[in-house]
Amino acid sequence: MKPKKEIRPKLDTDRIDDAVLALMYLTLHDGGRAWKGFDWETTNRLFKKGLISDPVSKAKSVWLSHEAQARSKQLFEQMFVVKEN
């Protein structure tokens, strides 16, 4: 008997990309670099969108464009900061 093939739901990759970009805000350093310890498919999509430098390198971090730096801060605050009343 063949093992059942796992059925994965269709993923919203734009939302995943936003979440990763928001998390990159936590590790921003040296004027715009962030650690690249995220899923390769996601970092490749961010690269293709022009938001980060090419993740395929020996460097352990990627450069975020000015647009990506601003967007990562905005997304981080939107997703993870508790709003005080």
Language-model features, listed with the residues they occupy:
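Short, amphipathic alpha-helical interaction segments positioned at domain boundaries
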Residues: 66-85
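Short amphipathic alpha-helical interaction segments
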Residues: 32-49
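N-terminal acidic leader/helix
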Residues: 3-37
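A short, conserved structural fragment
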Residues: 48-57
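Hydrophobic alpha-helical segments
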Residues: 16-19, 65, 69
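Minor-groove-contacting beta-hairpin "wing" of winged helix-turn-helix DNA-binding domains
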Residues: 59-65
